[in-house]
Regions:
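Structural signature of beta-strand start/N-cap positions in the alpha/beta core
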Residues: 7, 33, 72-75, 96-99
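Active-site loop/oxyanion-hole signature of alpha/beta-hydrolase fold enzymes
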Residues: 35-77
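Gly/Ala-rich beta-loop-alpha elbow adjacent to hydrolase catalytic centers
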Residues: 78-82, 86
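Conserved alpha/beta-hydrolase catalytic His-Asp/Glu region
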Residues: 111-113, 130-187
Length: 198
């Protein structure tokens, strides 16, 4: 629709896949040009990420995507790791973002979240891909939702196992998230920002 001039960018969390946002796309495309993207390193055939991969690298990737799409400004929605990508883009290239919506970010990593991350990492390293993928819903969704959506969840898990990214990439992304300290960057961001957290 040529009458829609504003662009809305969605950035996913640790999984990094654009299809995380699929349930929201139909609604938002009525009001915005929508851009969703798979983050670097999350495809089955992705090249290995560098050993010192950082959140700033994820932000640089998005800046490059925006420039390649000739986008001079956009609104931004990010979930968890994706929220921090938005913060870093706002710091690196503030002119590219107008408003930010940050879902489930944190100002510092608390013990509970760190424990969840460490357990997921241990599952992947010592038990394998299937256990890592099938445990993910337990960390992300309430029990009732899991029970009510068993079929679609199982289908998604089976697809995720088949298409799993290189394990070193998953660990590099997880470690970059665990190491990230958002407070300093957040203090420099002057954009209108809505934070939604539970």
């Amino acid at each position: 629709d040529k009458s829609i001039t504003k662009t809305l960018v969605f950035s996913s969390g640790l999984g990094g896949h654009a299809n995380f946002w699929q349930p929201q796309i139909d609604f938002f495309t009525q009001h915005f040009q929508v851009l969703c993207y798979d983050q670097q390193g999350v495809q089955q055939d992705s090249e290995l990420l560098s050993s010192n991969y950082q959140l700033k690298d994820l932000a640089t990737e998005l800046v490059d995507i925006l420039k390649c799409n000739n986008l001079s400004s956009c609104h931004f929605v990010g979930h968890a790791l994706g929220a921090f990508i938005g913060l870093e883009v706002a710091a690196q290239a503030p002119q590219l973002l107008e408003k930010l919506v940050l879902l489930n970010p944190w100002d510092e990593l608390d013990f509970y979240t760190l424990k969840c991350f460490n357990l997921r990492q241990s599952l992947l390293e010592h038990t394998g891909i299937e256990a890592y993928v099938k445990a993910q819903a337990i960390f992300l969704y309430p029990p009732q939702w899991i029970s009510e959506n068993a079929q679609i969840l199982t289908e998604q898990e089976n697809q995720a196992i088949v298409k799993f990214a290189p394990i070193p990439n998953v660990l590099a992304r997880l470690n970059s998230l665990k190491a990230y300290q958002p407070k300093t960057t957040a203090a420099t961001v002057n954009h209108p920002t809505l934070v939604i957290s539970n």
